[in-house]
Amino acid sequence: MSNSLWGSQFDLPKNDTSKLLNKVKKPKKVKTDEQILNSSTTSLQDKLAIIHKRVREILGVFEPYTRVIRTKEELVEYIQIANKQKVLAVDTETNNSLDPLTCKLMGLCIYTPGQKNVYVPINHSNWLTEKRLEDQLTEQDIAECLALINDDVKIIMHNAKFDKQVIQCTTTYKLRVDWDTEIGAFLLDENELRFGLKHQYRDKIDPTVEKYDITGLFKDVPYAYVDIDVFALYAATDAYETYKLYEYQKKQYELPEHKKLYRLFMEVEMPIVDVVTDMELTGVVIDKERAKRLSSKYRAKLDDCDRRINDELSKYKDKIISWRNSAEAHKKTKSSDKKTKGEQLKDPIELTSTTQLAILLYDILKLPLPDTGKRSTGEEELKKLNLPICDLILEKRGYEKLLGTYIDKIPECVSDVDGRLHCQFKQTGAKTGRFSSKNPNTQNIPSHEISIRMMFATEKGYTMIGSDFSQQEPRILASMAQDENMINAYLDGKDLYAVIASKVYNNAYEDNREFDVNGNMNPEGKHRRTSVKAVLLGILYGRGSDSIAEQLNMTKEEAGKLIDDFFKGFPKLKEWINAQQEFAKQNGYVEDLWGRRRRLPDIQLKPYEVYSKQKRVMFNPLLGTKGELKDNLVDQFEYKLNNSKNYWEYKKILEEIKNKGYDVKNNKGFISQAERQCVNAVIQGSAATMTKKAMIKVHNDERLKELGFKLLIPVHDELIGECPIENKELCKKYLAEDMIEVAKKDVCVPMKCDADDFPCWYYDVYSAEIKEQYKNGTSLEDLVKEHTECTREELEKMIVE
């Protein structure tokens, strides 16, 4: 007992008692379900318990509309109902895997109108024992039931290629698709940011669906371990949402203005799904030995480049030391400001760091900043600086890109299942309708590095067959523009670029060919031909006089004159370009040869948009409403800007506008870009569709099927496939015929396709270069030293072929 503020009958609180009181005062915060799920210390059992609870809380409202089918008899009955309804939406669930070759089909989601959303469990398992649960269907059951779907039933999917591949790889059944709502959405508006099922359903059907989003609950938890009835609440709605999207899209495509777009969807974009599905599953052989040799070759080049960079940096040694000791360097090193933290110049300098490279260029070497005023270290800026160290840095980046993106990356993508590379091709990857690809990006392998493409090969007894559309885009342009000079060049079998050059330079056709009548090189003709080719391709790709001038190493004025002379010789082409731009300004889009639309909303922008920094609001006392007050000054200012006669007058008006509390958005750059895109979108989109039509025809050609030909890779205007060696001549013939045939109806100039066979991709081009080097005096020994990606035997064969 002691006397204290607590009274004489109580002891003072002891130290441990104080701690206890603090705990009572500040109880420990209760973790949320999300925090527990994301904690590395939470057991799988506890995570599953939380998931089961949260799913029922959030999605329990869907329980009356959800059904789990656990027997084959029930599934047969449901499909019979779908046969009567003439439509069935299908979606797959896998064991958290996106690789069709290795994943398990965990469940199937289906929906037909008037019925409940159905989930069919297939491979759910006990989380503790990994043992497959009872009362589920097998993959064989699924295959047999899907085979009962009538031919007149429309099968709907979202991202159908993936679901088709999963079903085919796990059940061996090839399920057709009639409507892919992902592709349907893309054709209706390629400018949308997201084409995933949930985003499309939210944006087009039900904006409240976000409150039911529970995707994050399953992080790091295998779907297979989730209770079947619980998981059904999450998964079964996918097929229903796919069907509702189909209903929405069907109404859109039925509109009169979408007639051509619907035809493109049905005749090209849907049939190509089957082609790409099979092509991806086929895969392509990768020559790993060549990849190793290429890796060694380019790593040696990279090491040599690093050595030369160090030699070049040594020239700046005194400047670097001086800067390190300067107050500026000390300030950057000590600063804790986020913008400057980490700007220390390390020893040696890390040139892969854009920050350190900027210090070297702009602080130490005192080079002038680009026009933007930013300390940029991009490729364009480094080229303009024109310093040996900058050239070496670009060279180093090039080697690192080749190694990291292609040479070392491609062999890593080879599947362990069959030892082949299975690229992924995406129909919604490019807004013009071209395919994009990944794992790896076969559409973007540098054309100047032929040896990288030679990694793509075939198995023993097979050969690659390749065919490309010769001058595909210029031929389409000639047909669409109806330019007689271009059309006649193709009809007469002449070299288009030599014909164009003869018009531009006002001389004879023969004077503009690369070779004269005796087969000798014609340097002047080659130069003129190259110049007009740059102009034509510049028009196709939306490039201006600046870009063309840089490519041809001439002034902007000279490039401008060349472009003007070009259009004088081909006035119909200029008229057609103007017509495309005018159509886009009126409608907000352009349309390619087969109806694909490229929406260019920027072309309809005002050149200048003047706006007040503060909104002016007007109150209506009679109606009790308020709205934004119309500002007449805005119209006046925009009129002045649009009619300014020169740059100085424009600057004066701009100053007046800003002094009165207004601001200006200059949209001229966006408008110009959209105008340039008009031509590119129409021509590139038409070419993309032509290539897809060719792929469909080749894929469905029974002659090629009997010969064992399979498509492997499409690259813009080129199709690559493989076949048994003994069938190569017929395969080349039929492949070229099919490609030419698809354009006959819609293009008024004949397409030309050159088909060839080779042991690996680009072997023919590479072999020709080797032969040319040998012919020009390079010895076999020197060729072996230079081209280490090839064996001596390969090089010997190339020389004598």
Question: Where are the model-predicted features located?
Answer:
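Conserved beta-strand -> loop -> alpha-helix junction used to position metal-binding or nucleic-acid-contacting
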Residues: 173-190, 197-199, 354, 493-497
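Conserved catalytic core of nucleic-acid polymerases
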Residues: 224, 281, 415-418, 422-423, ...
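Conserved "right-hand" nucleotidyltransferase catalytic core of DNA-directed polymerases
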Residues: 2-128, 192, 203-205, 209, ...
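Nucleic-acid-processing active sites and adjacent nucleic-acid-binding tracks
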Residues: 113-155, 284
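Active-site palm subdomain of RNA-directed nucleic acid polymerases
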Residues: 254-268, 272, 690-715, 719
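Acidic beta-strand-to-loop metal/phosphate-binding motif
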Residues: 89, 153-160, 464-466
